[in-house]
Amino acid sequence: MLHSPVFPAFGHHLAQHPAMPLAMELPRTPKASFNIDSILSRTDRPASKLSMEMPSWQPPSPPSMPYRYSYGMMPYPPVWLIKPTVGYPNMAQQQPMRMPRGECLCPDPTCKERVLPFSHCPNGAMNPLSWRTGPCKMKRIRTVFTPEQLEKLEKEFLKQQYMVGTERVDLASTLNLTETQVKVWFQNRRIKWRKQSLEQKKAKLSQFGVIPADSSDHTDDSRETEEDEDDLDVEL
């Protein structure tokens, strides 16, 4: 028996408890077997318990799509050219094309009337975008002048058939009109004056029994003069 000079009772304590382990052992749980028979015969499956507590994630269902369209082939949302029919979301009803005043998107190089509102184009009823491929038909605007305005314009036309620059601006301001309205009035008045002059000339020649010459030259000259004018399709 061992005796410690420092702790005399230590040897006596060991003598009374010779089989006492130095460290306490914890109870061990039996190891689970992972062979096929043990897995199939198990009744307490923790996976099922976990699935009850935490349901598996499911992807959200795709949004409802109109009939006749598959996912990834959805049409573009309707713009102001197409208006869906009430009660039939899959049916489209064409609406007339309306452009802001002062704009014409006609790509035809011969179409110079770009200051008037867009009315419609040929074959526009078949395709809402067919106006991009053909010359557009411009909507005429009729400007109504008062008798005082017409009288003043006629007086100025007798003085000079062409009015440009500050004179036209001052006249438009005096008559409470726009410069474009005054410009178009003088343009149409010149065309009317040329036609009247040609008719008067033919009438005088017919009185003397003279057959008037072919007016093709005069027509060509008049056409060239009209082409030199600004092509503003506005009636007075």
From Swiss-Prot:
InterPro entries: EMX-VAX-Noto_Homeobox_TFs, HD, HD_metazoa, Homeobox_CS, Homeodomain-like_sf, HTH_motif. SUPFAM superfamilies: Homeodomain-like (SSF46689). GO terms for biological process: central nervous system development; negative regulation of DNA-templated transcription; neuron differentiation; notochord formation; regulation of transcription by RNA polymerase II. It is found in: Nucleus. One of its GO terms (cellular component) is nucleus. Keywords: Developmental protein, DNA-binding, Homeobox, Nucleus, Repressor, Transcription, Transcription regulation. Residues 138-197 bind DNA. It holds the Pfam family Homeodomain. It comes from the Eukaryota. Transmembrane segments: none annotated. GO terms for molecular function: DNA-binding transcription factor activity, RNA polymerase II-specific; RNA polymerase II cis-regulatory region sequence-specific DNA binding. Induction: By activin, derriere, fgf2/bFGF and wnt8. Repressed by bmp4/dvr-4. Residues 209-236 are annotated as: Disordered. The keyword DNA-binding applies. Its main location: nucleus. Expressed throughout the embryo during pre-gastrula stages. Localized to the dorsal lip of the blastopore (Spemann organizer) during early gastrulation, after which expression continues in tissues derived from the organizer. Expressed in the notochord during mid-gastrulation. During neurulation, expressed in the notochord, archenteron roof and the prospective floor plate. Also expressed in the region that will become the epiphysis, the pineal body precursor. Residues 223-236 have a biased composition (Acidic residues). Transcriptional repressor. Plays a fundamental role in notochord formation, acting within the mesodermal region. This is Homeobox protein notochord. It comes from Xenopus laevis. The lineage of its organism: Eukaryota, Metazoa, Chordata, Craniata, Vertebrata.
